[in-house]
Amino acid sequence: FDVNDGRQSFGILNTLSFIQEGLNGKDTYVENIRNRAEGQMTGMRAILQFAYLHQGEIKKMVADGRKVLVSGKANPKVSIQSEHASNGQKLSITLLSYTTNTDTVVVVNDYRPVVKSIYDVTKPAGYLVPAENKKLMDWVQRHALTYSTFKNQKGYKIEQYTIKSIDSIDFERDIIINPQVEANAYTGTIGEGDYIFIPTAQLKGNMVVLALEPKSELGLVTYPLFADLLKIGEKFPVLRVSKK
């Protein structure tokens, strides 16, 4: 769902990003394919024309937004679980009825235009990923994330999650895992080369948080490939590094 929707694409990098929705192609109205294609083309042309006419404003907005991400001065809170909520409004849409060839008004009573965060985390300075975990290291390499070796310095604290239990949560009509976790100070030792350090002060910093937090709806742990990172009663292998 998240990959197909482009949520790990340009939008999360503070770029002006659009998703143009269309019919799913599963209907039987083949005779309407021309109108559907022309409708898609019209929408795409409108977006391109708008971008061309406002290119200076868009480029400046994107550049300013990306500077905030790279500097680490972005919003310290990151929502890793959210839901669509109602604000009490009803949505009225005027449509043309193919049956009667007249205008008709469709009223959406269960209208949920507000995106409401239900679980936030404070963005850490970065994460420590075990260098021996090939699957995680492959993920880091494929996304070309900025990382370095880590030397434990004064002024930072290291935390590790314990997986207390694993529940479930509805995510846009999909049921995904929702682990209950507890964060505590890391008491182990960190040898040279044991971990790589991925800072959140980089262009893909928000993506890093969404990917590596165990309660994230878009986290790596929601994929079968990384399911072994979550084990009830055990420690989560990725560590959080925060400034004291």
Description of each model-found segment:
Residues 139-142, 148-149, 165-244:
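Catalytic centers of hydrolytic enzymes
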Residues 1-158:
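Hard-cation-handling environments
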Residues 153-169:
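Beta-rich nucleic-acid/ligand-interaction surfaces
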